[in-house]
Amino acid sequence: MIIMMNCFPCFTSQKSRNAPCTTNETNDDNVEHDEFRPPVVATTKRTEEREPAEQQPPVKTFNFRELATATKNFRQECLLGEGGFGRVYKGTLQSTGQLVAVKQLDKHGLHGNKEFLAEVLSLAKLEHPNLVKLIGYCADGDQRLLVFEYVSGGSLQDHLYEQKPGQKPMDWITRMKIAFGAAQGLDYLHDKVTPAVIYRDLKASNILLDAEFYPKLCDFGLHNLEPGTGDSLFLSSRVMDTYGYSAPEYTRGDDLTVKSDVYSFGVVLLELITGRRAIDTTKPNDEQNLVAWAQPIFKDPKRYPDMADPLLRKNFSERGLNQAVAITSMCLQEEPTARPLISDVMVALSFLSMSTEDGIPATVPMESFRDKSMSIALSRHGSCSVTPFCISRKDVGNKSSSSSDSEDEEEEKEQKAEKEEESTSKKRQEQEETATDSDDESDSNSEKDQEEEQSQLEKARESSSSSSDSGSERRSIDETNATAQSLKISYSNYSSEEEDNEKLSSKSSCKSNEESTFSRYDSGRDHDDSSRNTSMRINSLAHDDKEEDEEENHETRSYSDHDDSPRNTSMRINSLSHDDDEEEEEENHQTRLEHIHSSKSEDQSVYSDDDAGESGESSLHRIEAKEEEHISSDHD
């Protein structure tokens, strides 16, 4: 009879319909297990209203005794690790033989069962290959345990800093694949889940690796399950636990966003590149904080190879290293809005994780990145001489979460940048045109100056040739004195341009004090002529040598000042005419002396012009006059 009654739901009690299917006798009475385990018979209207609960992801419930047996009563030998949320033990389920990781949450400040189960349901919805899968839970009495899949390879921290004897270090491609997988998991939490899940505790110890180094993120979405939420003492200890990974806004007490996770991911990526811990107290004081140590290196691309992990032995593409450092530097920006989206980081790392030696190709389309600043930064890092792309604080605005607003802002920025580039290019073209015009004008002016100089030189040569033709005739003493006077005037004009007023004043005073001398020659004594002519020839030869030295000095002085100036041209012409006139004067003087000796009948006076030792012809007259006077006095 009882069996017959059990076949019909109308004879079953309400309590029996709501009874759970599992044999967990230690659960509290206020837990409604039918949310997870629907009744066997669902023919009533009440069960139809619970159809949404049937669509919940399957989450298995465990009793405490079963999990204690799986972990050997939570022995120390089964302990995998300990964090801010509690301890993690390795266990084996006796029913299936499956290896699991049992996380025993701290008992202090626990939520009620309803809140705990709501969070468990939200965790069960998060399914991704790069996330550790939640298998079940336990809520017996005051016990709160979570059961996850077991990842056999250990954590990224173990492979970077706690290598076993004989274990090979990870190569460059493996490290980039780990970074790419972690970025995929983080991108799922940020963009594929509504509302977005903020990791809050991303670090190397929370990235688990399987036997093939496939990364899986753990401890995600547990911030609401965190015991002691609201307790300032506990929160401060949590900050200390993640010190070195936490974003600057977290330490300032600001609200956390998805960009805070991007900063933590940048620290992990920097650890993969350098092989250094985020905080290492064994290093010198200026190298204990990894981010603070790396910030100056970001500005010097030549030092990028030096910051790479020595265990890599430089077995990586230099271009790929530069691009990885560029991505890291963007993730570690001080301002949250200046950091890239994790989706763009994921796309960039997808190319770096490939088995290529060229890094990210330059032909990656702009549409691959949601934020165009990432593509610009990577294109700038195509060579080894480009510094990391950094967005200034002035350009950083309050970016909205929607992609349409960010795209509009980026388009406006691009248009402004294009306009600025066009304006700068136009200015450069104008400057080049003006420079070419000025060069043409200068060339034409120089050609004109050369033509004028040549014409003046030709005129000077013509005048010198005409004067040489006329100098063949005998000129009187007055004509000779007039020529000497003209030479004195031209030379004084030249010297006035080169010397200062003091020298000119001293020269004029010297000229005023000197007097002209006259000598008379005895026409009756023939034997004196030969001695006098000999001394005069010797003096003329000495004067010629002195005059040549003075001419060379004048030429060097005239050519060293300004070659293209009209003043220099006139100085050259004066020097050339002066040289020609001096040669004519020498010839005329010799003919004049021969005429004096041949006539021997008249006394002639020679006019000497005193120029304070500056004019060669004047000094010659003074020397000759004095010698002739001395000879005449001896004969008398």
From Swiss-Prot:
Disruption phenotype: No visible phenotype. Lip1 and lip2 double mutants have a reduced male transmission. InterPro entries: Kinase-like_dom_sf, Prot_kinase_dom, Protein_kinase_ATP_BS, Ser/Thr_kinase_AS. The gene is LIP1. Keywords: ATP-binding, Cell membrane, Coiled coil, Cytoplasm, Kinase, Lipoprotein, Membrane, Nucleotide-binding, Phosphoprotein, Serine/threonine-protein kinase, Transferase. The modification Phosphoserine is found at S205, S236. Its main location: membrane. ATP binds at L80, G81, E82, G83, G84, F85, G86, R87, V88, K103. GO terms for cellular component: cytoplasm; plasma membrane; pollen tube tip. It is a lipid-anchor. The modification Phosphothreonine is found at T242. Involved in pollen tube guidance into micropyle. Participates in perception of the ovule-secreted peptide signal LURE1. This is Receptor-like kinase LIP1. Residues 403-434 form a coiled coil. Belongs to the protein kinase superfamily. Ser/Thr protein kinase family. Its EC number is 2.7.11.-.
